[in-house]
Design a protein with these regions (language model features):
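C-terminal structural segment of proteins
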Residues: 1-157
Protein backbone atom coordinates (compact mmCIF):
# COMPACT_ATOMS: atom_id res chain seq x y z
CA UNK A 1 0.00 0.00 0.00
CA UNK A 2 1.01 3.64 -0.03
CA UNK A 3 0.46 6.83 1.89
CA UNK A 4 -3.15 7.96 2.23
CA UNK A 5 -4.89 10.50 4.46
CA UNK A 6 -7.48 8.86 6.71
CA UNK A 7 -10.47 10.79 8.07
CA UNK A 8 -13.27 9.50 10.29
CA UNK A 9 -16.25 11.67 9.46
CA UNK A 10 -18.40 12.82 12.37
CA UNK A 11 -21.42 13.59 10.15
CA UNK A 12 -22.74 13.12 6.64
CA UNK A 13 -22.08 16.83 5.99
CA UNK A 14 -18.45 16.45 7.08
CA UNK A 15 -18.05 13.36 4.89
CA UNK A 16 -19.42 15.27 1.89
CA UNK A 17 -17.00 18.14 2.57
CA UNK A 18 -14.02 15.78 2.93
CA UNK A 19 -15.02 13.96 -0.24
CA UNK A 20 -14.28 17.14 -2.18
CA UNK A 21 -10.59 17.08 -1.22
CA UNK A 22 -8.29 15.62 -3.86
CA UNK A 23 -9.21 12.15 -5.01
CA UNK A 24 -11.04 11.10 -1.84
CA UNK A 25 -13.04 7.87 -1.55
CA UNK A 26 -15.66 6.87 0.98
CA UNK A 27 -14.85 3.89 3.18
CA UNK A 28 -17.21 1.77 5.22
CA UNK A 29 -16.77 -1.98 4.88
CA UNK A 30 -13.86 -1.74 2.45
CA UNK A 31 -14.61 -5.09 0.81
CA UNK A 32 -13.85 -3.75 -2.68
CA UNK A 33 -11.83 -0.59 -2.08
CA UNK A 34 -9.10 -2.04 0.16
CA UNK A 35 -8.23 -4.95 -2.19
CA UNK A 36 -8.21 -2.48 -5.10
CA UNK A 37 -5.80 -0.25 -3.17
CA UNK A 38 -3.55 -3.20 -2.30
CA UNK A 39 -3.22 -4.07 -5.99
CA UNK A 40 -2.88 -0.38 -6.93
CA UNK A 41 -6.06 -0.40 -8.99
CA UNK A 42 -7.23 2.47 -6.77
CA UNK A 43 -5.03 5.16 -5.28
CA UNK A 44 -7.19 7.69 -3.44
CA UNK A 45 -5.49 10.64 -1.78
CA UNK A 46 -7.92 10.46 1.15
CA UNK A 47 -10.16 7.85 2.76
CA UNK A 48 -13.30 9.19 4.42
CA UNK A 49 -14.57 6.61 6.90
CA UNK A 50 -18.37 6.70 7.26
CA UNK A 51 -18.73 3.30 8.93
CA UNK A 52 -19.74 4.74 12.30
CA UNK A 53 -22.23 7.33 11.11
CA UNK A 54 -25.56 6.42 12.69
CA UNK A 55 -27.43 8.39 9.99
CA UNK A 56 -26.14 5.87 7.43
CA UNK A 57 -26.94 2.72 9.40
CA UNK A 58 -30.01 0.60 9.87
CA UNK A 59 -33.30 -0.30 8.27
CA UNK A 60 -36.49 1.74 8.55
CA UNK A 61 -39.90 0.60 7.34
CA UNK A 62 -42.76 3.06 6.98
CA UNK A 63 -45.83 1.68 5.25
CA UNK A 64 -44.63 0.28 1.93
CA UNK A 65 -41.37 2.24 2.01
CA UNK A 66 -38.14 0.59 3.13
CA UNK A 67 -35.07 2.75 3.78
CA UNK A 68 -31.69 1.11 4.26
CA UNK A 69 -28.69 3.22 5.26
CA UNK A 70 -25.62 2.96 3.02
CA UNK A 71 -23.37 1.84 5.90
CA UNK A 72 -25.70 -1.01 6.86
CA UNK A 73 -23.89 -4.34 6.66
CA UNK A 74 -25.23 -7.27 4.67
CA UNK A 75 -25.58 -9.10 7.99
CA UNK A 76 -27.77 -6.36 9.42
CA UNK A 77 -29.89 -6.27 6.25
CA UNK A 78 -30.37 -10.03 6.42
CA UNK A 79 -31.32 -10.06 10.11
CA UNK A 80 -33.59 -7.04 10.39
CA UNK A 81 -37.01 -8.25 11.56
CA UNK A 82 -38.88 -5.29 10.01
CA UNK A 83 -37.28 -5.99 6.62
CA UNK A 84 -38.00 -9.72 6.88
CA UNK A 85 -41.69 -8.82 7.08
CA UNK A 86 -41.71 -5.97 4.54
CA UNK A 87 -39.41 -7.49 1.90
CA UNK A 88 -38.41 -11.04 2.84
CA UNK A 89 -36.69 -11.75 -0.48
CA UNK A 90 -34.22 -8.88 0.03
CA UNK A 91 -33.41 -9.99 3.58
CA UNK A 92 -32.93 -13.58 2.40
CA UNK A 93 -30.74 -12.48 -0.52
CA UNK A 94 -28.50 -10.51 1.86
CA UNK A 95 -28.08 -13.62 4.02
CA UNK A 96 -26.46 -15.42 1.06
CA UNK A 97 -23.91 -12.75 0.13
CA UNK A 98 -20.28 -13.88 0.33
CA UNK A 99 -19.09 -15.56 3.49
CA UNK A 100 -19.61 -14.53 7.14
CA UNK A 101 -16.66 -12.10 7.05
CA UNK A 102 -18.05 -10.32 3.98
CA UNK A 103 -21.58 -10.23 5.44
CA UNK A 104 -20.34 -8.68 8.69
CA UNK A 105 -18.11 -6.00 7.07
CA UNK A 106 -19.52 -5.38 3.59
CA UNK A 107 -22.25 -2.76 3.20
CA UNK A 108 -25.20 -2.28 0.93
CA UNK A 109 -23.93 1.19 -0.02
CA UNK A 110 -20.52 -0.11 -1.04
CA UNK A 111 -22.05 -2.88 -3.11
CA UNK A 112 -24.41 -0.49 -4.87
CA UNK A 113 -21.73 2.17 -5.49
CA UNK A 114 -19.36 -0.43 -6.95
CA UNK A 115 -22.05 -1.98 -9.20
CA UNK A 116 -20.11 -5.20 -9.72
CA UNK A 117 -21.98 -7.32 -12.29
CA UNK A 118 -21.64 -10.31 -9.94
CA UNK A 119 -23.28 -8.43 -7.05
CA UNK A 120 -26.83 -9.19 -5.94
CA UNK A 121 -28.11 -5.80 -4.81
CA UNK A 122 -28.18 -4.02 -8.20
CA UNK A 123 -30.52 -6.61 -9.76
CA UNK A 124 -32.67 -6.70 -6.63
CA UNK A 125 -33.00 -2.91 -6.48
CA UNK A 126 -33.85 -2.75 -10.18
CA UNK A 127 -36.53 -5.43 -9.74
CA UNK A 128 -37.97 -3.61 -6.72
CA UNK A 129 -38.07 -0.25 -8.54
CA UNK A 130 -35.92 1.23 -5.78
CA UNK A 131 -34.71 4.79 -5.42
CA UNK A 132 -31.11 5.50 -4.38
CA UNK A 133 -30.81 8.58 -2.16
CA UNK A 134 -27.47 10.41 -2.05
CA UNK A 135 -26.45 13.48 -0.09
CA UNK A 136 -27.63 15.58 -3.04
CA UNK A 137 -30.50 13.86 -4.86
CA UNK A 138 -32.73 10.86 -5.42
CA UNK A 139 -32.03 8.55 -8.36
CA UNK A 140 -34.31 5.81 -9.70
CA UNK A 141 -32.46 2.48 -9.80
CA UNK A 142 -32.91 2.20 -13.58
CA UNK A 143 -31.10 5.54 -13.97
CA UNK A 144 -28.49 4.81 -11.28
CA UNK A 145 -27.07 1.53 -12.61
CA UNK A 146 -25.44 2.46 -15.93
CA UNK A 147 -23.26 -0.52 -16.86
CA UNK A 148 -20.51 -2.76 -15.54
CA UNK A 149 -18.96 -1.03 -12.52
CA UNK A 150 -20.61 2.22 -13.61
CA UNK A 151 -23.27 4.22 -11.76
CA UNK A 152 -25.03 7.55 -11.98
CA UNK A 153 -23.12 8.87 -8.97
CA UNK A 154 -21.61 12.29 -9.55
CA UNK A 155 -18.58 13.87 -7.93
CA UNK A 156 -19.18 14.54 -4.24
CA UNK A 157 -22.00 12.02 -3.83
Amino acid sequence: MYSVNYHRAASVAEAAKLLKSGDAKLLSGGMTLIPAMKTRLAAPSDLVDVSRLKDLQGVKVSGKTVTIGAATTHYDVSNDEKLKKACPALAHMASLIGDPAVRHKGTIGGSIANNDPAADYPAALLALGATIVTNKRQIAADKFFKGLFETGLKEGE
